[in-house]
Amino acid sequence: MKTLIKNATLVNENELQVADLLIEDERISRIGANLHPKGDYQVIDATGKYLLPGVIDDQVHFREPGLTHKATIATESRAAVAGGVTTFFEQPNTVPQTVTLERLEEKFAIAQKSSFANYSFFLGGTNDNLEELKRLDPKACAGVKLFLGSSTGNMLVDDEKTIEAIFSNVDLVIAAHCEDEATIRKNLAHYQALYGNDIPIDLHPHIRSAEACYLSSSRAIALAKKTGARLHVFHLSTAAETELFRNDIPLKDKKITAEVCVHHLWFTADDYDTRGALIKWNPAVKTAEDRAALWQALLDDRLDVIATDHAPHTLEEKQQKGYTNIPSGAPLVQHSLVAMLEKAHKGVISLKKIVEKMCHNPAILFDIEDRGYLREGYYADLVLVDMNALWTVQKQNLLYKCGWSPLEGQQFHAKIVSTFVNGQLAYNNGQVCPTPYGQRVTFNR
């Protein structure tokens, strides 16, 4: 099967180029002007549209196994391809937790049957599974995930000797959720003394505070420098944390890297008034000054990748009474790319920089094989975008199993027209193909 995409504006490797792109089977076979391949092929006229590499989201929670009333790998990967996300790395805080090699392979087996996007997973670290982490083949999965602050699923790793042993012995990316547990507990106790469990939601960033984030991130970075570990700090949310990261060496040479999430680039603490607990995340959405600093650090390359931390809960769960009863997290994977393209429309970030942070850099950071770029011989994971097709996020166009979005009512100028996964048309003009084409991601390690 061949598909010829004609006259697209390719956004790739810091260039915009009008060209044709030929897909043969799973791969990009040719890129150039006025291609006329031999034999039968389908033609897509992409005049006036932009062709991007598929987005690689390095942090999602798809809730399977065990929490499938919220989401499944099938439902959320459908939403992903509708949003231009062709590869995801899923987190270990499912039920049961993904903390053994056996549980890890069980997840791969689920995804092999049901994932519409390419997939890999993180093996979770705990206070007592160091030997399991040592047995992990570096090529087997995305990396190891450590919760250095407690969050959904209660996978807190708080034994300092264990953390240092993991940093010293794990020979692949260690992705860390960094919030200082003692600081959070102290802050929570303070506000519970004032409000009981009816703590106003706008105090969430005071409980899961900037201080808690900085303490934990700085401690993890110091330990990574001491041990030589390959540390990737997830979801930076504060101005202070951005000062901990470098931009004076290429990403491929960095041992310590950072991710920022769409919601920390989009919302501020002012939005708690209108969105309430729907925008309760860990780490918390913080001040406008924090958001501005995150944008600056993203644009000057101290922050390396943009992701979602897609973390669905049911609307009933999010609308519960009582601060500690309300789970943190929200669905975003269907809207991460269009949200960033909206920022491009407003002149905040360039298309080239979006592709760098959402496509190229995750591939570099995780040593992903043959994905993340528009290159001959690479897998044809592609997104065709119309930059001028105004539409509104509404319940009826959501594909998340949970059926809600923190972005409902938001207008976007950019629209995903088509998404290709491994050369197959996975999404086209509002419809997801019924066949899941996702494959297990392989790594050059």
Residue spans for each PLM region:
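Short catalytic-loop micro-motif centered on adjacent basic/acidic residues
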Residues: 90, 120-123, 230-235
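Alpha-helix-loop-beta-strand connector modules within alpha/beta enzyme cores
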Residues: 101-117, 165-176, 335
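Divalent metal-coordination and catalytic microenvironments
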Residues: 8, 21, 26, 48, ...
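C-terminal cap of metal-dependent C-N hydrolases
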Residues: 322, 376-442
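His/Asp/Glu-enriched, well-ordered alpha-helical/loop segment
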Residues: 198-219, 223-228, 278, 299-300, ...
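Histidine/acidic residue-rich metal-binding segments in metalloenzymes
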Residues: 131-147, 152-306
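Histidine-rich, glycine-flanked metal-binding segment
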Residues: 1-4, 9-53
